[in-house]
Amino acid sequence: GKRVDYSARTVITSDPNISIDQLGIPRAIAMNLSFPEVVSRNNIKKLTQKVKNGRYKYPGANYVIPVSSSNTQTWRGRDLRYSRNIKLRYGDIVKRHVLDGDPILFNRQPSLHKMSMMCHKAHIIDDDRYSTFRLNVSATPPYNADFDGDEMNGFLPQCIQTQTELSIIADIKKQIISPRYSKPIIKMVQDSVLGSYKITNDDTIINWRDFMNLSTYLKGIDYNIIEKGKNYSGKKLFSKIIPDKINIKHKKTEIKDGDLINGFVNKTVVNNLIIGYSWDRYGADKTRNFIDNCQRLISNWLLMDGFSVGLGD
């Protein structure tokens, strides 16, 4: 295909610690791409510091396009490789580096349906040792991506209107339900599914220290209900991440008011039922939080209680 400005392409690697709507971006890419921010009363101090940092210090800026006396931009931008002693004025345009939270349009080819391009929030990896995009593994099914060397493309929108449009229309958390199947397409996969089954088995017991430790990885948890010195079931810990007022009966599994009472959580329960009901009742944000919490909980619990595969399997 053709080459375009304000884009980046590199290999993707998995990261279960970032949210499904975040995209880990290497610092080298964040410094190469730029967003044109107009200088105003609200941001002149921040942008002045970025101009002082220049092109080679993050977070900095690459160019300054000064406003002319007739209040129109002169497109002869000043390259901050050669000049950093610039006094900003209201109306100037500073082409600053990519920052945490900036919307990024992310794409994997071949682009076969609308979810082949979705909007993520930038999460800058401030370490020169890493040079790949980081993607949550639960966000891979819509892209049909895996981590065996796939490359993906990022596109940085160049105005606030485009940022807003992407955030409203193409935000990945609003694409959790597939328009083709009307079922969740962004869901638990691989270790998260297996771990959800293991942690909700009847014989899983967790002491209060591990219970507290695992709870620190979760968002929106009430710590006051955890009693010191008491053992808890794995069902109790998993119940803490299920949204309130979710009621499910499926074969032997029973969830009442967000509390797992009987049975276990398998692939059907966690993906089709919990995520599906959460989407219908609470919408995108709470469903995104459940997926993030489930992934963090299971990933860290499996470090304590793993599993093995033998020849018999």
Map each language-model feature to its residues:
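Flexible, glycine-rich loop/tail regions that form catalytic "lids" or insertion modules at the edges
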Residues: T13-S14, Q22, Q109-L112, N136, ...
